[in-house]
Amino acid sequence: MKRKQTIAAMNERGRRNEPFVFVIDFETTTAKLFRPDETDKIWWQANKQSNFARPVSEEKEIEWETKPVSFHQYKKGYDLVQHHIHNGDTYLLNYTQPTTVKTNLSPEEIFHLSEARYKVLLRDEFVCFSPEIFVQIDAGKISSFPMKGTMDASLPNAKERILNDSKELAEHNTIVDLIRNDLSLVAENVTVEKFRYLERLKTNQRDLWQVSSKI
């Protein structure tokens, strides 16, 4: 579904007071809408709500081999980011690179094994999961919970180290200010209810301390 069709379909379902699940690509050019109870094309979980039945887990030795990009390729992008920051073109940027994964798990198995609060599986296309709420609307109140900064929870004094890190603080100040400004475009009386609180996240390698805010 294209952009204009998506907006029209969302508005129509909203007008009829019909809940729906939607998936949009990062360029916002293509989208898909589903009923919350559809399971043939999409599985989803949002906090404690979901549309799938959890299967009985089978003991299986998991094969998981990652192949990150080379240091040279990573540094090439990093240097470009630094150039634009020093040039004043941006002051906050999420720099990521793709990592190839070789595994004996199916997308469905990856979906079920993930302990993330939020996850979605679009059949024959992708699986995605995140610990983070982007935006939440409840009873006319819109909230966002930006996460910036992680640290290995097993490190000595990890909590104190991440909260006292000047780089992490500067990054968090920036994203909170950006999200607050964005919410002010669509809402009134925007406030920061919680600034820099810690959450413990479990990953397949180790536990992490994650710094969040509530706006």
Pin down the residues of each PLM region:
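Extended alpha-helical targeting/anchoring segments
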Residues: 1-215
